[in-house]
Structure formats: C-alpha cells, structure tokens
Amino acid sequence: MFDAAHRLERYKGKCEKLHGHTYRVRVTVVGTPDEEGMVIDFVELKQLVNEKVLALLDHSYLNEIMPQPTAENIARWIWDRLEPVLKTEKRRLYEVTVWETADSFVSYRGEGHEGRTESEGQ
C-alpha cells in the first residue's frame, strides 16, 4: 500500500482537484517453480516492489512522477518498473492490479493486452 496525492488534468469532475488515496497494489508473477518449489520468494518480491515502486510513490504527488496519474496509468507505470527486473527464463510478470478505493481497481497485463477497470457500486 501507499498513500499519494494527485489530480486529473483535462478531467471534468471532482478528481480534477488535488486529492489523495491510500492505494493498494497486487503484483502477480507466473512461471515454473524452482527447486525450492517457488516461482519467486515472497521476500524477494516484496523487496523489489518496495524498492522499485513504493519507495518512489508513497507520500508523493503523483503528477510529478507520471503524466495524468489515473489508476490505469499508475498500473502501467508500476508494470514498466517491475517487468524488466522480474523477468527470467523461468518466470515473468503477469499482472499488476491497483486499487484506488476498496471497491474500484484496475488491472494491467502489459502491451498487447486490454486493461481492466472495475468498480462495485454502492
């Protein structure tokens, strides 16, 4: 999880104003388990996510890090930072999911795949 502020430029609505969220991130890696029976050690995965993503995004102003920081663009930004360091002969990054609220999230699976946005109404 990380806390950050942003605003959506060129957007007509309340999100064009400066506001913040507590974002939740899920990173999914697929591949062939190693001799220990793991696709990737949770310790290694958490360390990479902390170093490459959370250390940069937590308590930041996202507009200074990426253009138009929608949940979709945040997921893609995270993908672009993690995909090269997670890819090996036996594993690869499969999906990045970002929750902007408890019931609104997006998933990204890289270039050539459609993104997915979901929200549960209340």
Locate each region found by the language model.
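Charge-rich, low-complexity N-terminal segments
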Residues: 1-122
